[in-house]
């Protein structure tokens, strides 16, 4: 019923995703009250609201925190929740082409936000248009657009304080066929005294890495305090040592970025740097060696947490050591954990607090897990639609990622990454396969119709 409309608008769908990618909408929480997440986030919101209005929808800008695009009549409200903020991207991170200059090649659309989440938002918008122009429904359908998803969710919290809550829906910000469970998310800050014998630590840098990204870069700059020559064992292909003036030098570590929900897909530059330091230096205390030996840098269920891996049907606990900071002889380590749905976030934090004496542990943020029965109406309906439209025979899955599906009851994440495809969220050369995006739009149209008729 809806496929022909989406096929006929394929070029326009891709064009509109490109227009969104051109806006470097990295959320900036230090912005002013007129632009709570920065001018670029305001610009991208106004762009899509103007687009929605031109397509015949009702729209609303909610104080530049978020907005929505809506059609239909009725008391009940079906929701689709996406976001237009993106994680940072720099050309010197290794992008083949500039991250905010969209490019189509080999059937893929490249650019920051192409799959997370600008492409899926546009796919959802055109799915709404296909339904609106083709049939009548008995409920309202609202596409809610956030601007702070990659950080603290202040946008969706603002929405919840000021606007009507949908009673059912999905977020196009993960994987097909559908997500029945999302792990809990726990971000911790660890602090402890740290110094290296015979060296002054001038700087430790992780290049402003986001806590939900596996760090691709880490460095430490040292000044030697005696006149002895330094002899460092560098058996690491991804470690670089640069001699500077005045008896100083910089050690740099180079890894591979990935989403913190899948740390196994990346190579953590902090972990590499720590291993190098332990191989080459002596320390004023045993802190770094102790946390390393206890498994703090393990990416799968750090061994100090339990004798056996912590896991359930939602998967195994994962850990991403994301950020290092250093000031006044204090080393700060920021960690992002994805915790199986049956395990208490408080219990995990307590185990970190008990890891070592004098270790200070603070909770930076947390999100409780979500779990919806696989045989619920919502999960079964969306999985059936996906399998029918795609030709797959897939079952619902659990993920470590955190999506807006957590914002409301009776919501799940739904696409756009297809089964068996690599998750390109937060990665260098992020892309979405064009055929997959068009198929996702067709799937969303059918889902909107089934949930709102």
Where are these regions (language model features)?
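An extended, acidic, His-containing surface patch that forms the Zn2+-binding/catalytic region
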Residues: 48, 261-328, 338-347, 359-453
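Acidic/His- and Gly-rich active-site-bordering loop/insert found
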Residues: 2-110, 134-137
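Beta-strand segments within the central parallel beta-sheet cores of soluble alpha/beta enzyme folds
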Residues: 138-146, 204, 289, 363
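Active-site metal-coordination/substrate-binding segment of hydrolases
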Residues: 77-145, 151, 164, 427-428, ...
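Midchain, well-structured core segments that form catalytic/ion-binding scaffolds
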Residues: 150, 156-340
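Short beta-strand
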Residues: 58-62, 241-244, 321, 397
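Acidic, glycine-rich active-site loops and adjacent beta-strand->loop/helix elements
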Residues: 84-86, 144-153, 172-177, 418-420
């Amino acid at each position: 019923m809806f496929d022909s409309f989406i096929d006929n608008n394929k070029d326009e769908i891709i064009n509109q995703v490109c227009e969104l990618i051109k806006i470097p909408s990295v959320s900036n929480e230090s912005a002013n009250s007129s632009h709570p997440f920065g001018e670029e986030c305001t610009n991208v919101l106004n762009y899509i609201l103007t687009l929605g209005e031109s397509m015949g929808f009702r729209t609303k800008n909610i104080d530049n925190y978020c907005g929505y695009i809506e059609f239909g009549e009725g008391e009940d409200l079906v929701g689709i929740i996406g976001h237009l903020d993106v994680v940072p991207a720099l050309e010197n991170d290794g992008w083949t082409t500039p991250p905010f200059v969209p490019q189509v090649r080999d059937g893929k659309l490249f650019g920051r936000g192409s799959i997370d989440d600008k492409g899926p938002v546009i796919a959802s918008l055109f799915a709404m248009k296909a339904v609106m122009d083709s049939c009548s429904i008995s409920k309202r359908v609202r596409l809610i657009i956030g601007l702070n998803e990659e950080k603290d969710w202040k946008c969706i919290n603002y929405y919840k304080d000021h606007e009507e809550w949908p009673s059912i829906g999905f977020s196009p910000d993960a994987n097909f066929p559908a997500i029945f469970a999302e792990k809990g998310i726990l971000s911790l800050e660890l602090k402890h005294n740290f110094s290296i014998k015979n060296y002054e630590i001038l700087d430790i840098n992780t290049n402003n890495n986001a806590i939900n990204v596996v760090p691709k870069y880490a460095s430490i700059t040292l000044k030697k305090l005696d006149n002895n020559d330094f002899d460092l064992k560098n058996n690491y292909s991804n470690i670089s040592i640069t001699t500077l003036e005045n008896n100083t030098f910089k050690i740099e570590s180079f890894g591979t970025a990935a989403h913190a929900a899948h740390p196994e897909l990346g190579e953590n530059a902090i972990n590499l740097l720590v291993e190098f330091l332990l191989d080459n230096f002596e320390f004023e205390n045993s802190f770094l060696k102790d946390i390393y030996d206890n498994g703090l840098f393990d990416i799968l269920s750090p061994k100090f947490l339990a004798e056996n891996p912590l896991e359930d049907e939602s998967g195994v606990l994962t850990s991403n050591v994301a950020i290092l900071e250093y000031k006044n002889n204090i080393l700060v380590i920021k960690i992002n954990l994805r915790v199986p749905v049956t395990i208490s976030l408080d219990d995990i934090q307590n185990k970190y607090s008990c890891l070592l004496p004098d270790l200070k542990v603070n909770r930076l943020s947390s999100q409780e897990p979500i779990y919806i029965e696989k045989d619920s109406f919502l999960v079964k309906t969306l999985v059936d639609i996906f399998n029918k439209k795609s030709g797959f025979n897939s079952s619902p899955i659990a993920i470590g990622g955190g999506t807006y599906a957590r914002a409301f009851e009776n919501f799940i994440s739904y696409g756009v990454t297809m089964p068996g495809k690599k998750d390109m969220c937060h990665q260098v050369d992020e892309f979405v396969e064009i055929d997959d995006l068009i198929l996702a739009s067709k799937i969303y149209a059918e889902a909107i119709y089934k949930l709102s008729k």
